[in-house]
Amino acid sequence: MRLVFAGTPEFARIALDALLAAGHDVPLVLTQPDRPAGRGLKLTPSPVKQAALAAGIGVAQPRSLRLDGRYPDEAAAARAQLERVAPDVMVVAAYGLILPQWTLDLPRLGCLNIHASLLPRWRGAAPIQRAIEAGDAETGVTIMQMDAGLDTGDMLLERAVPIGAQQTAAQLHDELALAGGQAIVDALAALGQGGLAPRRQPDAGVTYAAKLDKAEAALDCSLPAAVLARRVRAFNPVPGATIRLPGLDDPVKVWRAQALEQAAGGPPGAVLRADAQGIDIATGQGVLRLLELQKAGGKRQPVDVFVRGWQP
């Protein structure tokens, strides 16, 4: 099947690799423009661009696909490239640009999106993190036929993935990326044989995964310890949960923590104990034990190392 692939981060790169390994013809990739990255803020191509160039695939990087937007010349050039390629399908995974109607209409079989949740739960920008934050027992990937709405298109295929009790967003991301790559390969195989029946998303159970905000990183110790422990996992690695500890001017990043089902024994935010086993923080309900931390400008440290250089 002749495909155009639109995606940007590592999640999308894994799907592109799966499509190429399955033998699909991918003559063109759309991805976000190169961005500054690293300490030197050097312009760096996206993971998808790097994979495409390594495979000898053409790459387009328009800043917008809207013909009436801020970059109409770039959008028109991308449209001309797509029309020359004449794809059967466009596969979209974490691309980062809104697809206008002309884009949805151009491929013979439309545009298919790999979404990292079991729709209609967690439509939107951060489904992996919000599923962990909410305490969901499972999530998954959905292959859907794209329409003009925000993740509202008909579903073609779903794959459920359990969420581990200590699983971080980084770990779940990697698992869902692999599941998404296999799911889109399976969906295209079934689509080619006429074996996929689109299903309308149910009206019940719709939730939205709001984009992550750096302000959310600061742990509010008035909340229950269980909520805070989930946020630590959900925000690992980005934006990274932080907490303020006595004696330190800057917030400390929390990489691992656990909720203890015991009375707080102090006002929210109070340090109840600090030793090699953990730093216990009183919360609005229960105790949050900090297990791995990182000072500003420092390295990640297990708590037994961290407490040697810090005392409340």
Curated annotation (Swiss-Prot):
Record CDD domains: FMT_core_Met-tRNA-FMT_N (cd08646), Met_tRNA_FMT_C (cd08704)
Record's keyword annotation contains Repeat: no
Disulfide bonds: none
Pfam families noted in UniProt: Formyl_trans_C (PF02911), Formyl_trans_N (PF00551)
The organism's place on the tree of life at top rank: Bacteria
Gene Ontology molecular function, alphabetical: methionyl-tRNA formyltransferase activity
Binding-site positions, (6S)-5,6,7,8-tetrahydrofolate: 117-120
InterPro entries: Fmt (IPR005794), Formyl_trans_C (IPR005793), Formyl_trans_C_sf (IPR037022), Formyl_transf_N (IPR002376), Formyl_transf_N_sf (IPR036477), Formyl_transferase-like_C_sf (IPR011034), GART_AS (IPR001555), Met-tRNA-FMT_C (IPR044135)
Transcription keyword on record: no
EC number: 2.1.2.9
SUPFAM superfamilies associated with the record: FMT C-terminal domain-like (SSF50486), Formyltransferase (SSF53328)
Catalytic activity field: L-methionyl-tRNA(fMet) + (6R)-10-formyltetrahydrofolate = N-formyl-L-methionyl-tRNA(fMet) + (6S)-5,6,7,8-tetrahydrofolate + H(+)
Primary enzyme class: transferase
A GO cellular component annotation in the UniProt record: cytosol
Keywords for the protein's UniProt record, in alphabetical order: Protein biosynthesis, Transferase
NCBIfam families in UniProt: fmt
Family to which the UniProt record says this protein belongs: Belongs to the Fmt family.
Function: Attaches a formyl group to the free amino group of methionyl-tRNA(fMet). The formyl group appears to play a dual role in the initiator identity of N-formylmethionyl-tRNA by promoting its recognition by IF2 and preventing the misappropriation of this tRNA by the elongation apparatus.
Name of protein: Methionyl-tRNA formyltransferase
Source organism per UniProt: Bordetella parapertussis (strain 12822 / ATCC BAA-587 / NCTC 13253)
